[in-house]
Curated annotation (Swiss-Prot):
InterPro entries: Bact_exopeptidase_dim_dom, DapE_proteobac, Peptidase_M20, Peptidase_M20_dimer, Peptidase_M20A. Pathway: Amino-acid biosynthesis; L-lysine biosynthesis via DAP pathway; LL-2,6-diaminopimelate from (S)-tetrahydrodipicolinate (succinylase route): step 3/3. This is Succinyl-diaminopimelate desuccinylase. The keyword Ribonucleoprotein does not apply. It is an enzyme of class 3 (hydrolase). Its cofactor is Zn(2+); Co(2+). It holds the Pfam family M20_dimer. Keywords: Amino-acid biosynthesis, Cobalt, Diaminopimelate biosynthesis, Hydrolase, Lysine biosynthesis, Metal-binding, Zinc. Coiled coil: none annotated. Zn(2+) 2 binds at residues 107, 142, 360. Homodimer. GO terms for molecular function: acetylornithine deacetylase activity; cobalt ion binding; succinyl-diaminopimelate desuccinylase activity; zinc ion binding. It catalyses: N-succinyl-(2S,6S)-2,6-diaminopimelate + H2O = (2S,6S)-2,6-diaminopimelate + succinate.
């Protein structure tokens, strides 16, 4: 059994459902300490939702110019769902047909294990590197995300810590490890629209005000804008901005009562061609044009970010090609990740991890061979970035 697989199984066996780290960071910290890393645990959150974060850093000796590479990830996992629906216990690492099964097998305990072992092997071959190496781990990525990576990033920014490169171990591959990496992500912004009406008997509509009827034309216009790609056209790196309704609540459940209010939840996934302010302005303009009596609350989950081809992207692409022969695809598709927080303090951020087909599912799994492939890609990236410093 490879050292990467062994460590991955150790981590998978820990039931670290958000926000519980379940000792994962202690296992990793002990290995990093032996490599000369300085460890800092940053806890955050209320007593009933205590989050554990780890910042581990190894700085080179001497005064030669250095650059900092951070491996970022999370030790928490999503809930298992009904355990009885799993073929094997979700927190008992199990091998079947060349695959490793368990919660976190893809998202993202194998990535974290590959991070650590790649560093161990890199330092064994290059004991005094010019690179500053760091790991940022949290137990609050799969949850609200307010006491995890963002807390560490804010602390690093406050102390003036410089981060040049960051690799986030999110599962990004589609069919084979390395076939896709994320060099950016769309922004996310949610709205909660409360439409005010007057409740009444359905037989006496003149004595009531139906909020569903009132908002329907405005929603139809917003849907039409979205269907026509009318928010923006996107660009070479980003798909056009998308708007979707996620929930619509109205009524008492009775069939003879006009509801007194309606609540609609919606979300934008937006490109760099739009801003939160521009999208908010357009939505409000539509609502105002239809005379909708409403209250609208906005939540910005993250701004779009993009790492254009440069030192980090080139190093990762070359590492993937050397290890797998794949010409990797750069993408900004999909949901959000903690990379949105890191991008505020680091200009070059990419996400690179295993195949994502089974993440968050019953019987989550990864091809065993892919684990070593990922570790080797990380190590080759380290080697290339180190070589760029000494040229």
């Amino acid at each position: 059994m490879s050292r990467t697989l062994q460590l991955a199984e150790q981590l998978i066996s820990r039931p670290s459902v958000t926000p519980d780290d379940a000792g994962c960071q202690q296992i990793l910290g002990e290995r990093l300490a032996r490599l000369g890393f300085t460890l800092e645990t940053i806890e955050s959150g209320p007593a009933d939702f205590r989050v554990t974060n780890l910042w581990a850093v190894r700085r080179p000796a001497g005064t030669a110019p250095t650059k900092t590479l951070v491996f970022a990830g999370h030790t928490d996992v999503v809930p298992t769902g009904p355990v009885e629906q799993w073929t094997s216990h979700p927190f008992t690492p199990t091998h079947r047909g060349g695959k490793l099964y368990g919660r976190g097998a893809c998202d993202m305990k194998t990535s974290v294990a590959a991070f650590v072992v790649s560093i161990e092997e890199f330092l064994a071959a290059t004991p005094d590197p010019r690179l500053t190496l760091a790991l940022l781990l949290t137990s609050d990525e799969e949850g609200p995300g307010v006491d995890g990576t963002v807390i560490v990033c804010n602390a690093l920014a406050a102390r003036g810590e410089t981060i040049d490169y960051c690799i986030v171990g999110e599962p990004t591959a589609v069919e084979r490890c390395g076939d896709m990496i994320k060099n950016g992500r769309r922004g996310t912004m949610s709205g909660k629209l409360t439409v005010h009406g007057v409740q009444g008997h359905i037989a006496y509509p003149h004595l009531a005000k139906n909020p569903v009827h009132a908002v329907a034309p405005a929603l139809a216009e917003l849907v039409a804008i979205n269907a026509a790609g009318g928010w923006d056209a996107g660009n070479a790196y980003f798909q056009p901005t998308s708007w979707q309704i996620s929930n619509f609540h109205a009524g008492t459940g009775a069939s003879n009562v006009i509801p007194g209010s309606a609540v609609i939840d919606f979300n934008f996934r937006f490109s760099t061609e739009s801003t939160p302010e521009s999208l908010q302005k357009r939505v409000h303009a539509v609502l105002d044009a239809h005379g909708v009596d409403c209250t609208l609350a906005w939540t910005i989950g993250g701004l779009p970010f993009l790492t254009t081809p440069g030192e980090l992207v080139s190093a990762v692409q070359a590492a993937i090609a050397d290890e797998t022969g794949i010409a990797t695809e750069l993408s900004t598709s999909g949901g959000t990740s903690d990379a949105r927080f890191i991008a505020k303090i680091c200009k070059q951020v990419v996400e690179l991890g295993p195949v994502n087909a089974s993440i968050h599912k019953i019987d989550e799994h990864i091809d065993v061979a892919e684990i070593e492939t990922l570790k080797n890609i990380y190590k080759r990236t380290l080697e290339r970035l180190e070589a760029s410093l000494i040229q």
